[in-house]
Amino acid sequence: MRRYLFSGDFGSLPEKDYDVVIIGSGIAGIYAALHIDPSLKVALVTKVDLTSGSSYYAQGGIAAVIAPTDNFDSHIEDTLTAGAGLCNEEAVRVLVEEGPENIGELCMLNVPFDTNPEGDLQITREGGHSCRRIVHCGGDATGRETTKRLGQIAQTKENIDIYFNTYLIDVLTNDGKVCGAVVCGETPEILRTPSVILATGGIGYLYKYTTNPKGAVGDGLACAVRAGAVSENMEMVQFHPTTLYAPTASDRLFLISEAVRGEGGILRNADGEAFMADKHKLKDLAPRDIVTRHILNELTRRGETNVYLDVSSMSEEFFSKRFPTIFEECRNAGINVPEKPIPVRPAQHYMMGGIKTDLNGMTNVEGLYSCGEAACTGIHGANRLASNSVLECLVFGRRAARHINAAGRTQLPLPEIEISSAAETVSSEEIAADNDKIRQTMADYANAVRRPSGLKKGLSIIRELKAKYDGIALTSKEAYEVCNMTVTAELVFEAAIARKESVGAHYIVED
């Protein structure tokens, strides 16, 4: 595996100095930036803008112990149960116990949470939770409203420079310690820094069908691994049970939030049978991996493309107010909800694994941090509990920032690096074809139901592509992304092959 993707004389690149460089502008990245000491200079780097990441599309809400009838032990137990025995219990306890305080901070920052007529936070229930503990914004627009508000605040901070339309190429190290990052907007440049936070999100765009936006290719993870960081639980890829099924759908599939089932939605097959009724004690609100597999079994058994989410128990007034985004999307697709059921099927949604970190977001590389979906604190184990993801962004984004504030690191000199560019290049058409090949390979062989022979075949295909991109000159964002995709995909296949038993989202059937 090549150490650096950039080819040429690093010393020829323009340089800027920062105390902290944060790659990624979802909730984890922005929230971390807002918690960096105002005396420290921060670069916040985003591939497109502050609303282009997965955070913006998060519908359900944020899980936290807010209700007087709820308690920490219950939330912890629900999280551990969903994680199927692979959670880091210490990390889970930190997540849960620091949750309410972070919700309080968001309230003070005027994030517009939905409230009841008495002015208290409105709380709903989602799959895997034993009680109502999900706070939300705009009905089903929690990610959008939270990201927008945090982004507005970040743009007013004098110590934060935001790099729009800029992507990460390399994390630089000197003697195993972070000393900068190579990024590229119009042209490549070096951001010198002793501390880098990777908040680059998930790997959804490695799959043909996903709820993630196009930029979610695992590039932060790949850069971290090339810099010497360790990955963990890479086989644990979550597939959301319910995305809107439309034959003409775009690459990013529209999510039908878990909260719809929390408010009474029932999964049915084409004959109207509520097939989850006898499959799990929580029925339609069972953990996501379980619901996903039962939907796939139903589709295979019946030879059909989708099942249906029956929402007829809700009035049109309630549904349109509680789920305005879903209501509008369904109506635009010609589905007369809530009278008519919503056609749904599973799609890739979330990465439980990622860059291994401690409870302060620190990796094994000094000065390199990660938080949010890009990181693996061990919270989610083998299967993430609904609405714990945004909570993780908050709790560990803040923890990473506070650790950096206290560390007082000084800038190291940049290493003297000059990498001769390979003579061979590939055309943009070939890069696009290889991108498609990776996504199809992941969909075929690293999906929700896996076979040993398929995993080996998929790994062989990915390794062939990886060797190809390790030996050519990379001259475009698209080429860098495909190279990173091969690194991340290889990690998924290797981890899936290494884990012989089925657990949580990693489900193996014999050939």
Feature locations, PLM:
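Glycine-rich active-site loop/strand segments that organize a redox cofactor
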Residues: A64-L95
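An anion/pyrophosphate-binding glycine-rich loop and adjacent beta-alpha core
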Residues: C223, A229-K340, H403-T410
